[in-house]
Amino acid sequence: MQVDSRIVVTLTSRLYADEISKLQERVGSVVPLKDSHRLQNLNSVGMYSVYMRNVAPDFVAMFSYLSEATLAILDEVTPDTLVFSRLDHSQNYELKNVYYPSFAWHSHTLLTVVPPVFGREAATVALESNGFEIVFPVVMPHALAQAVLQKLMLYNIYARLSDANVGDVNMDHVRFHATTLHHMGRAYTLHIDQANPGGMLGLLDNLAIYLAIISALLPNSLARLLPAIMRHEQHELLNIFAGVAPPDDGGDFNIEDDMQKMESFMAYMQSVSSIFNLGPKLRLGQYSSETQSGTAWLAS
């Protein structure tokens, strides 16, 4: 059954010619919308609600917003309306690589929708005619998106250590390494050093708490499995950790206790994994670098 995925955004004023031109350059790009309704207004479009001008950005809040928002593709721009196609898991879509900065895409790869971590200005189309700014996300290869998250987390870890006077932290050195992303011979600057640390620090607090709880919930049988595997040399990489494994205490196994611990252990492990989840993911099928477009669908 064909699902009507068309979303129409009605503008309060007619767009200027240069605004139409700038938006038409973005046709084929992914845009988050606040709602899934068929008829919406301009305030629903893009990431302005979580990335306002002259406000320190909270990138963790932006990742969360992207995960919860309705994702759509900008299909058409007219003087009075913007037309989108809502992304659905059962459909394929024509996606264009028209983001700033632009990263090379390749066929049969995984893409991730991330906040505009490379700067708000490059990601924004200002609509003076309507007194609004559309802030676009960036769609980039998943491996690069993971690198962005790693740098974002490490920068905030070191910033917190520096603020707490723990050790000798050279923030200029940290900033140099954590705010630069290298890819295919080019260097990209991450605008994360002026971000609001609230969301990331909360995430790091949760991570520390979860890891502490997980260490206490580790089933005895699982803890004693590591030395057993080492003795039988079932995996060569375990030799690296030979000096780390605790000695077997030789106590009796308790399956009832381990069953309870394993249930909680797995629940908290899933919580930890959710911390590292990035924004929505798209599976790219065939991609043409000449047209900068390819077939894509939402990845589960």
Swiss-Prot record:
UniProt subcellular location: Virion; Host nucleus
Taxonomic superkingdom: Viruses
Pfam families hit by this protein: Herpes_V23 (PF01802)
Primary localization: virion
Molecular-function GO terms, alphabetical: structural molecule activity
Alphabetized InterPro entries for the sequence: Herpes_capsid_2
Keywords: Capsid protein, Host nucleus, Virion
One GO cellular component, as annotated: host cell nucleus
Subunit text: Interacts with TRX1 and major capisd protein/MCP.
Protein task: Structural component of the T=16 icosahedral capsid. The capsid is composed of pentamers and hexamers of major capsid protein/MCP, which are linked together by heterotrimers called triplexes. These triplexes are formed by a single molecule of triplex protein 1/TRX1 and two copies of triplex protein 2/TRX2. Additionally, TRX1 is required for efficient transport of TRX2 to the nucleus, which is the site of capsid assembly.
Family: Belongs to the herpesviridae TRX2 protein family.
Protein name: Triplex capsid protein 2
Species assigned in the record: Equine herpesvirus 2 (strain 86/87)
Taxonomic lineage from the root: Viruses, Duplodnaviria, Heunggongvirae, Peploviricota, Herviviricetes
Record gene name: TRX2
